[in-house]
Every structure is written in C-alpha cells, then in structure tokens.
Regions:
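Pre-P-loop entry segment of helicase/translocase ATPase cores
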Residues: 1-24, 268
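Walker A/P-loop
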Residues: 22-42
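Walker A/P-loop NTP-binding motif
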Residues: 39-51
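Conserved nucleotide-state-sensing and coupling region of NTP-binding domains
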Residues: 59-115
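Conserved RecA-like ASCE ATPase "motif II neighborhood" in helicase/translocase motors
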Residues: 99-155
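Two-metal-ion RNase H-like nuclease active-site motif
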Residues: 107-114, 261-273
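ASCE P-loop NTPase helicase motor core
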Residues: 143-207
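ATPase catalytic-site recognition across NTP-hydrolyzing enzymes
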Residues: 204-269
C-alpha cells in the first residue's frame, strides 16, 4: 500500500531512544502526527530488532484502551511478513493473549490502564525497560486539578518505580490539551527530554510535510475554530473567555497627541490575587 515518509522529528525521536537506554522522554506532538504509531509500534519494534528491549509496558487511559493500543504491535509481530522474513516468526502459541503476550525470542509486552496497579510487573528476570504512556489526559481529567495531581503522582511513583532503579526508557506521548495536565507536569519534571511538534512550524510550514499540506491544515483551522485548533494542533490550550484574541483587536495608526480634543486614561488595578485577574490593564481613549 501507499506509504508516507517519516518527518525529521519522528526519525530524531527513534534515534534518541535508540541511543539512550535510560531516558525520560515526552513527545508533545500535535494530533494526527503519528505519536501512537511511532512510540507504541515502530520504535519498540526497532528496539526489539536491535535487542535493546526486553519488557514493554503500554499505558492507556483505560485497560481496554491500553489493550487496543497494544494490539497494534501484536498484529505487526503476527502478520508483518517483512518483519517475519528478517527476524523470524514472532507468535508463540499459548503466550499470545490480549493485553499480554511474549514473542518467540522471549520479549514480553503488557498493557495497563490509567491508575491500574503496575507493581510487581516483570517477566522472568526482566523488569520493564520500555514504558510508554499514551494520551493519558482527557477533557474531563484536565478540568479536575485533584485528579491530575493524583495521576501525576501515580506516574512518577508507582509506574516509574517498575523500572529497574530508574533504568529504562520512560516515555509519555500526547498533545497538550490543558495547562493543568499530567503531560504538562511530566514535561516540567527535572531531566525530561521534550520533543514539541505543532502542526505548523515556526516558519509557517507543515511539520510533517509528507503527510499534510498547509492548505489542508488551514482548512482544519477554519472548521475547528481558533481555540480548538490551538488546543489540538498547536499544543496551546486556551481557556475560552480568559484571553483577548488577536482577531478581536483592530489596529490603526494613532494621531499626534495635539490632534485630539481630549484624552482619557483608565487603569483597572484588579486587587484580587487570583490568576484570573489582570492586575495591569490600562486603556487610553482619545477623541
């Protein structure tokens, strides 16, 4: 079938994980930029072929979701004839369950849901050495600071603790749908390597030009609207009503001050100490 060439950022991610057996890595990639394909399927298959992976754990927002995601790499091992031709038959009858399977060369793959206990995870003598947390945040979660805090703690304690003393590749992937989110907290942690990819790069071009044209992306933006597009495609979550949007502002060249009949300046000090108050709003009117 038709294939799409990888973008430089996708190749860089694979090489970074290949070259660093111990790393905490965050892929903050826009929707539609193959986060799951690379981190749940392509990269672990690559690491396994290089004999750099023994036990993979894939974490989703629920047990069913995680098992569905793990099913993609399981299907590749079972049916991808190119991989089988190069590395041999992978399926082992009796060790090929949904959500948990072992390949012919003794590499294990487990699925876990959000918050599900990962303690004691191992296969024979191996503890997990590749953990990927895929799209853990959702719309409901990011609106609940207490749940975000609890889940962040679970990720950094119970889940990270399944590695062998921190050794291994510990990855989290998703697009930034909330400033208060597990992904945001993960990226802010000391030592985490962050790969941030927006649908449109700083030069106004598609980040994955082999997949998307700028016309397609702009059409998405028109349909989705500014706030939704920024959230889903540009890793810029905006709370509606909390900002002044650029398209609301009308710019003009001001006259010299002597040309105005009068000027009125108003300052709103907003003495409340919450983050929603703009404590430096000043407006100048002239007529």
């Amino acid at each position: 079938g038709k294939h799409t060439d990888c973008a430089p950022f996708q190749i860089k991610a694979a090489h970074t994980l290949r070259d660093h057996p111990t790393i905490q890595y965050a892929a903050q990639w826009a929707r539609g930029h193959a986060k799951s394909v690379h981190f749940d399927v392509g990269i672990p298959m690559y690491l396994k072929a290089l004999k750099k992976l023994h036990l993979m754990v894939l974490v989703g927002k629920s047990k069913d979701n995680a098992e569905t995601l793990l099913g993609d790499i399981q299907a590749e091992f079972e049916f991808n004839q190119r991989y089988i031709s190069d590395f041999g038959v992978q399926k082992v009858t009796g060790s090929w369950e949904t959500g948990k399977f072992v390949t012919a060369d003794g590499r294990a793959f487990f699925a876990r849901g959000r918050g599900q206990s990962p303690r004691g995870l191992r296969y024979k003598k191996y503890r997990p050495d590749y953990i990927v947390i895929d799209d853990l945040d959702d719309d409901e979660l990011v609106n609940n600071p207490d749940r975000v805090a609890r889940l962040t703690k679970w990720v950094k304690e119970a889940l990270f603790g399944t590695l062998d003393g921190g050794r291994g590749r510990f990855c989290m992937v998703g697009n930034l749908i909330g400033k208060n989110s597990v992904l945001a907290n993960f990226m802010a942690s000391d030592g985490v390597v962050v790969s941030k990819v927006n649908a449109i790069d700083k030069n106004g071009k598609p980040s994955w030009a082999a997949k998307w044209t700028i016309e397609e992306i702009r059409a998405e933006e028109r349909f989705m609207g500014y706030i939704s597009f920024q959230r889903e495609k540009m890793n810029n979550p905006i709370t509606e009503g909390s900002i002044f949007r650029n398209d609301w502002i009308r710019w003009c060249r001001p006259l010299r001050l002597a040309k105005y009949d009068y000027l009125v300046c108003y300052c709103d000090p907003s003495f409340k100490s919450t983050t929603r108050n703009d404590y430096k709003a000043i407006k100048l009117w002239g007529k």
